[in-house]
């Protein structure tokens, strides 16, 4: 089993560690400083406050005939263009996106895309990965065939995740799942951009209340249009009263979980999150016309 991780950021590096330690033939595609760091030092990561190292193959160019069983990538359109002529059959996309999967398949060919989303977060500081998987009950690694069907390759992916001890879930409609995910993460990230002191945004009652209102609005619209939410627990944003939702949000932003899985990404990728904000709000605005 050969697996290529396209992109050596926090998420790619964490999955590379887990897959390599589980015994899979794992390669990372990297560029720039990260490429140099991995080539010179190996993949350094923190586990239980101890710095460890995994030696892993690193490449900065992919041959067309260099075939992998699965390719995981998160830098979407650049990656798809580079992977277009490669002969590997399975490309697992792990990105926040509102685009249709047909648009992706128009680049690499029909039947190669297996949409997914990671359940992880953390940071890389001084070339050392400090990251962890999201608790299963909050957000496991999520995936589905575009058709929603269970196939040989989804079963193969399940076995990989089980062997690597990566929590996972297979859903029926990945596009609906991603719409609901964006309906949640866009307001959560927006909160940090609405205050002068993002690290302590959980103490800002007005921002917390506005975030609760935005979440409630998003999921009201999503449910009206889709007639379902995925995962089912997203209904909590529709059902809970604003004061209770505000209280829960405040506690979440103040927590270690909030810092690791929400704050770090929102602060390090504001351009990405603001673009997703624009895309998501334009998308649901069309439903209201």
Predicted regions and their residues:
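Rossmann-fold dinucleotide-binding core
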Residues: 98-179
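Helix-loop-beta segment of a Rossmann-like dinucleotide-binding subdomain
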Residues: 130-144, 193-203, 256-268
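NAD(P)-dependent Rossmann-like dehydrogenase/reductase catalytic/cofactor-binding core
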Residues: 216-289
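NAD(P)+-binding Rossmann beta1-loop-alpha1 motif at the extreme N-terminus of oxidoreductases
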Residues: 1-51
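Rossmann-like NAD(P)(H) cofactor-binding subdomain of soluble oxidoreductases
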Residues: 50-130
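Hydrophobic anchor at the start of a short beta-strand
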Residues: 3, 25-26, 91, 113, ...
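Generic structural signal for well-ordered, non-membrane alpha-helical segments
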Residues: 12, 150, 154, 207-215, ...
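Active-site-proximal catalytic alpha-helix in oxidoreductases
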Residues: 175-202, 206-219
